[in-house]
A protein has these predicted regions:
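Feature captures the catalytic cores and cofactor-binding loops of soluble hydro-lyases/lyases
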Residues: 1-131
Length: 131
C-alpha cells in the first residue's frame, strides 16, 4: 500500500482529501477502496442494503448531511459489513454501538456517536456525487 502522502505527491491534481473532521470508530484506522456513495438523511435502510452486498475493495461513503439526530451505523451493520468484506465506511453523520464496532476488522469514520437509531423509510439515493 502506497502511503497517502506519496499518493498526494504523485497525483496532486487528481485526488480529493476528506476534511479531518472524522473520528475513527472501527477496528482499522487505515483503509482504501473504490468509493460507493449514498446520500441519506436520518434513514439507514440503504446503508444496510449496501453493506449486505459484496464490498471487496470498496468503501461506503455516506453523506448523512452531518445530521446529529441519530446514528446511521451500529454494531449489527458493522458486523454485516465486515462479513461482506467492505474495506471501510465513512459517514458524514453518526454511529452507535461503539464497543461493537471497534472489534470489527473494518474501518469506520464518522462525525460522532449518538445512541438513537435511525428511521427506516427506504430513503436516500445511491451513486451520487458528494462534495
Amino acid at each position: 500500500m502506497l502511503p497517502t502522502a506519496d499518493i498526494c505527491d504523485k497525483y496532486p491534481e487528481s485526488i480529493l482529501i476528506a476534511k479531518p473532521i472524522f473520528k475513527d470508530f472501527g477496528g482499522r484506522t487505515a483503509f482504501f477502496g473504490k468509493a460507493v456513495t449514498l446520500k441519506t438523511l436520518d434513514d439507514n435502510t440503504k446503508v444496510r442494503s449496501s453493506l449486505e452486498t459484496d464490498g471487496t475493495n470498496k468503501v461506503l461513503v455516506v453523506d448523512g448531511e452531518g445530521s446529529m439526530n441519530c446514528a446511521l451505523l451500529g454494531g449489527n451493520l458493522a458486523s454485516i459489513a465486515s462479513e461482506n468484506n467492505w474495506s471501510g465506511i465513512i459517514i458524514n453523520g453518526c454511529v452507535r454501538d461503539q464497543l461493537e464496532i471497534i472489534v470489527e476488522k473494518i474501518g469506520v469514520k464518522a462525525l460522532a456517536a449518538h445512541p438513537k437509531k435511525s428511521i427506516k423509510n427506504d430513503g436516500g439515493e445511491f451513486n451520487v456525487t458528494l462534495n
